[in-house]
């Protein structure tokens, strides 16, 4: 498998997503994904399986530095203090002291984008994440996020397939 590079991040092009995979199934399936050669594992706070993802990675025998781990902060945690606490909780569940990529899961107008991006930058500066990004942002929000961020926004993770044309965002 090959990597793509974006703003200093080298990201495995093909990742194994854990959306809608219950915890017990994660414990069974993620080891097979790792054995098959996947080195990018994607999870999120809202998926409810971060602990099992962390357990599967820890038990894999693969060095943590050889796995690219992505998680996402859920919208209810976007206020600065809640954001910081939720990242610490995610790291504990994932059994690691950093994630390779941390994303804002969805846009949330209830919290200013400046506060959201500020929190992303704070956890990056603290060494808890290597790279930051967003998910499901439209082009205007993405442009604003880039302007607000001290650190590079390395990705806007979106759903893209023949039934969802997102060429405008791409």
Where do the language-model regions lie?
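CE4/NodB-like, metal-dependent polysaccharide N-deacetylase domain
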Residues: 83-103, 122-126, 147-148
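Beta/alpha (TIM)-barrel catalytic core signal, keyed to glycine-rich beta->alpha loops juxtaposed to Asp/Glu
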Residues: 107-170
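Short, acidic/polar
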Residues: 21-34, 79-95, 113-115, 140-144, ...
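N-terminal binding-site loop/beta-alpha segment at the start of enzyme catalytic domains
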Residues: 1-67
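Conserved, mostly hydrophobic/aromatic
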Residues: 16, 33, 41, 53, ...
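Active-site mouth loops of central-metabolism enzymes
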Residues: 12-24, 71-81, 110
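A short, structured active-site edge motif that brings together acidic residues
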Residues: 64-77, 98-107, 136, 159-160
């Amino acid at each position: 498998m090959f990597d793509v590079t974006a703003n200093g991040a080298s990201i495995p092009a093909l990742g194994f997503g854990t959306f809608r995979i219950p915890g017990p199934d994660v414990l069974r399936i993620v080891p097979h994904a790792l054995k098959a050669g996947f080195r990018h594992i994607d999870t999120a706070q809202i998926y409810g399986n971060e602990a099992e993802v962390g357990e599967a990675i820890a038990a894999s025998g693969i060095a943590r530095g050889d796995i690219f781990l992505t998680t996402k902060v859920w919208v209810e945690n976007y206020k600065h203090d809640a954001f910081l606490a939720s990242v610490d909780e995610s790291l504990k569940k994932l059994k690691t002291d950093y994630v390779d990529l941390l994303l804002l899961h969805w846009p949330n107008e209830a919290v200013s984008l400046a506060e959201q991006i500020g929190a992303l930058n704070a956890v990056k500066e603290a060494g808890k994440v290597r790279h930051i990004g967003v998910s499901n942002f439209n082009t205007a929000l993405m442009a604003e996020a880039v302007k607000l961020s001290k650190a590079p926004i390395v990705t806007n993770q979106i759903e893209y397939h023949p039934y969802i044309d997102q060429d405008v965002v791409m």
